[in-house]
């Protein structure tokens, strides 16, 4: 069974709480166990706790959830881009999948609410698939013919 952790932003709570609910439902549907749900103040804060989560033996992958709503400035772009960059860095460094379920930048509140289910489900599905494929790849042995991992 794949064990995932979820890190969810509290900012734009009306959106992110729905995302968390959909993510938990989808993880159960896929047969994954959610070992941790960690709340952080905002999307920009997500990378702060990722290293601690990926270091845990009972975490095979991490799902990040958040919503960066467009404002009058380009602040949403800075927040979303920097968080995404750091999330990917930590995933590559740790060797554990960390998926991006972050709505934005450039989304208004209505668009964010419309994307809740899609972003949450896709992030969970990607985490589960990557964790399973990573395990399969570790156990795979080349024996003269192409090894397909899907």
UniProtKB/Swiss-Prot annotation:
EC numbers on record: 2.5.1.78
Any coiled-coil regions, as ranges: none
InterPro entries from the UniProt entry: LS (IPR034964), LS/RS (IPR002180), LS/RS_sf (IPR036467)
Active site residues of this protein: 75 (proton donor)
GO molecular function, one term: 6,7-dimethyl-8-ribityllumazine synthase activity
Highest taxon of the lineage: Archaea
Catalytic activity as recorded in UniProt: (2S)-2-hydroxy-3-oxobutyl phosphate + 5-amino-6-(D-ribitylamino)uracil = 6,7-dimethyl-8-(1-D-ribityl)lumazine + phosphate + 2 H2O + H(+)
Biological processes, Gene Ontology terms: riboflavin biosynthetic process
Binding site for (2S)-2-hydroxy-3-oxobutyl phosphate: 72-73, 115
CDD domains for the chain: Lumazine_synthase_archaeal
GO CC annotations, alphabetized: riboflavin synthase complex
Keyword Transferase belongs to the record: yes
Binding site for 5-amino-6-(D-ribitylamino)uracil: 11, 43-45, 67-69, 100
Pathway: Cofactor biosynthesis; riboflavin biosynthesis; riboflavin from 2-hydroxy-3-oxobutyl phosphate and 5-amino-6-(D-ribitylamino)uracil: step 1/2
Enzyme class: transferase
The UniProt record lists the keyword Transferase: yes
PANTHER family: 6,7-DIMETHYL-8-RIBITYLLUMAZINE SYNTHASE, 6,7-DIMETHYL-8-RIBITYLLUMAZINE SYNTHASE DMRL SYNTHASE LUMAZINE SYNTHASE
Stated role: Catalyzes the formation of 6,7-dimethyl-8-ribityllumazine by condensation of 5-amino-6-(D-ribitylamino)uracil with 3,4-dihydroxy-2-butanone 4-phosphate. This is the penultimate step in the biosynthesis of riboflavin.
Protein's name in the database: 6,7-dimethyl-8-ribityllumazine synthase
Source organism of this protein record: Pyrobaculum arsenaticum (strain DSM 13514 / JCM 11321 / PZ6)
Gene name, Swiss-Prot/TrEMBL: ribH
């Amino acid at each position: 069974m794949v064990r995932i952790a979820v890190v969810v932003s509290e900012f734009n709570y009306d959106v992110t709480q729905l995302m968390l609910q959909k993510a938990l439902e989808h993880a159960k549907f896929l047969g994954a166990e959610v070992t941790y749900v960690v709340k952080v103040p905002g999307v920009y804060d997500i990378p702060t706790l990722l290293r601690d989560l990926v270091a845990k033996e009972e975490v095979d992958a991490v799902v990040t959830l958040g919503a960066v709503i467009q404002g009058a400035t380009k602040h949403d772009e800075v927040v979303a881009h920097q968080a995404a960059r750091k999330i990917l860095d930590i995933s590559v460094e740790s060797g554990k999948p960390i998926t991006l379920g972050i709505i934005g930048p450039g989304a208004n509140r209505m668009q964010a609410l419309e994307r809740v289910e899609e972003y949450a489900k896709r992030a969970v599905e990607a985490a589960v698939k990557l964790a399973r494929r990573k395990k399969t790849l570790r156990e795979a042995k080349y024996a003269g013919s192409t090894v397909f991992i899907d």
